Structures are given as structure tokens and as C-alpha cells.
């Protein structure tokens, strides 16, 4: 088997696994777009008012939050979605898999979900409410809770 071989690809995929993959992909696509817009703006203009920066500690511009959004939640979620769906074997993540007893994408899903809940909580404390907070906060919580269900956990558990 190669490093990109997949585990038991023909095994029945529960609906909850499809749902987790869809939620990760949705978060990933939204975060790539949002992160890009925070870093580069839309038409050269920032998508968020600079006065919001006054309430956010440790940052002077939207680049750092944009990079976290783009790379961490954007690309990270898309890679995790691929991992949940295909379960590729990547040798460099073998230690994590031995530690958890699950495919690396299970751990990534929980970390991304918990990170998203934390991110939205910090947003709620720092900037005015947005409907996106009401969408992506519960999405993060759903990722954590779904990853812990027997159907998802069992599907991603190493045999």
C-alpha cells in the first residue's frame, strides 16, 4: 500500500459521516472565502471596519485573523473533510492515530469543531453580532458532537 492508500473504501458509509464531511466542506469553503477577504479585502477594501480592531487584543490589522481563518479553518477543514471521506493513510500521522485509536481525521474534526466554537465565542466578545456567527458557531459544536457519535467514531476507528 502507498501512503495515500485508503482504508476499506467499500465499507458502508453512515449518513452521519456524510453529514460531518459536508459540514467540514461547508466550513472550509466559507473560511477560505472569508479568510481571503479579510487578508486582501474585496475590491481593495476591508470587509470589516477597522474600528473593530480596537476591541481585539494582539492584532493591528485583519491579516492575522484572516490567515488563521484561511489556513486553519479553511484549508484545515477541507483536508479533514477529505480525510473523513477517503481515510487516506499518511505515515507521518501514525503516532496521532496510535494515540487516539482513530484515523487522524477524527481528531482533526474535533479540534476544528472546538476551535470554531472558540473562534465564534471570541468574536461574540469582540465585535458586533453577525448572522454568520449564528451559523458557524453551532456548526462547530455539531462537528464535535457528531464526531463523538458511535456511527462516526466507529467508522473512523482504526481496526
Segments and roles (model prediction):
Residues 2-159:
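Topology signature of small-to-medium multi-pass alpha-helical membrane proteins
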Amino acid at each position: 500500500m502507498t501512503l495515500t492508500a485508503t482504508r476499506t473504501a467499500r465499507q458502508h458509509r453512515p449518513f452521519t459521516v456524510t453529514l460531518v464531511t459536508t459540514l467540514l466542506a461547508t466550513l472550509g469553503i466559507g473560511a477560505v472565502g472569508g479568510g481571503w477577504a479579510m487578508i486582501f479585502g474585496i475590491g481593495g477594501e476591508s470587509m470589516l471596519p477597522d474600528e473593530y480592531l480596537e476591541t481585539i487584543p494582539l492584532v493591528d490589522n485583519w491579516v492575522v485573523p484572516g490567515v488563521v481563518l484561511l489556513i486553519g479553518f479553511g484549508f484545515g477543514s477541507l483536508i479533514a473533510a477529505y480525510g473523513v471521506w477517503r481515510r487516506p493513510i499518511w505515515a507521518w500521522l501514525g503516532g496521532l492515530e496510535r494515540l487516539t485509536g482513530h484515523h487522524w481525521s477524527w481528531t482533526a474534526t474535533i479540534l476544528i469543531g472546538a476551535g470554531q466554537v472558540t473562534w465564534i465565542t471570541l468574536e461574540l466578545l469582540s465585535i458586533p453580532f453577525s448572522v454568520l456567527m449564528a451559523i458557524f458557531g453551532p456548526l462547530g459544536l455539531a462537528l464535535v458532537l457528531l464526531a463523538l457519535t458511535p456511527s462516526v467514531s466507529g467508522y473512523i476507528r482504526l481496526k
